[in-house]
Amino acid sequence: MAVMTGANTAGVDKEVATQALNAELQDKGFLLTSTEDIINWARTGSLHWMTFGLACCAVEMMHTSMPRYDAERFGIAPRASPRQSDVMIVAGTLTNKMAPALRKVYDQMPEPRYVISMGSCANGGGYYHYSYSVVRGCDRIVPVDIYVPGCPPTAEALLYGLLQLQRKIRRTGTIVR
């Protein structure tokens, strides 16, 4: 990772001098990077997720944190309180009565906060899409970062979605809404 500085006057290609300096310092056990990159690296390695299980997808969501899949080896651990969570996983059918509660819990989460929509019902209403009491996708209530398809999606699919969220955070930094 190269660092651009204002004092770097290596001609047209300023990256050449910076890369040489980085290589020399790495040989001696030092690393040059930006603070934002370190914060994003730490954020992806310590995601705390909160479950918002509404229907059958919640069973698969519970499987993800069990020993067979062991999400904690990726730095992803469950939390019970929205005030300690970075990620909310919405799994299942979201009804009109439950939508204000979902928004309230989302608002209690600290910034930056991320949402994963898990399953067909959370993504777009699923089997109950035309019901009068169902919200046709939780993205109408809260902004969604990752969609995990399936009815119900497997624990592997949710784990893949969590890893994709980590990738998205590393690639884009803090997601500005």
Curated annotation (Swiss-Prot):
Gene3D superfamilies per record: 3.40.50.12280
GO BP terms: aerobic respiration; electron transport coupled proton transport
Binding-site residues, [4Fe-4S] cluster: C56, C57, C121, C151
Signal peptide: none
EC number annotated for this UniProt entry: 7.1.1.-
Keyword entries, A-Z: 4Fe-4S, Cell inner membrane, Cell membrane, Iron, Iron-sulfur, Membrane, Metal-binding, NAD, Quinone, Translocase, Transport, Ubiquinone
Self-association and partners: NDH-1 is composed of 14 different subunits. Subunits NuoB, C, D, E, F, and G constitute the peripheral sector of the complex.
Top-rank taxon, per record: Bacteria
A molecular function (GO) term: NADH:ubiquinone reductase (non-electrogenic) activity
Family: Belongs to the complex I 20 kDa subunit family.
Cofactor(s) for this UniProt protein: [4Fe-4S] cluster
Subcellular locations according to the entry: Cell inner membrane
Native species: Ruegeria pomeroyi (strain ATCC 700808 / DSM 15171 / DSS-3)
Membrane topology, record value: Peripheral membrane protein
Cellular component aspect of the GO annotation: plasma membrane; respiratory chain complex I
Main location: membrane
Catalytic activity: a quinone + NADH + 5 H(+)(in) = a quinol + NAD(+) + 4 H(+)(out)
Function summary: NDH-1 shuttles electrons from NADH, via FMN and iron-sulfur (Fe-S) centers, to quinones in the respiratory chain. Couples the redox reaction to proton translocation (for every two electrons transferred, four hydrogen ions are translocated across the cytoplasmic membrane), and thus conserves the redox energy in a proton gradient.
Stated name of the protein: NADH-quinone oxidoreductase subunit B
InterPro entries: NADH_UbQ_OxRdtase-like_20kDa, NADH_UQ_OxRdtase_20Kd_su
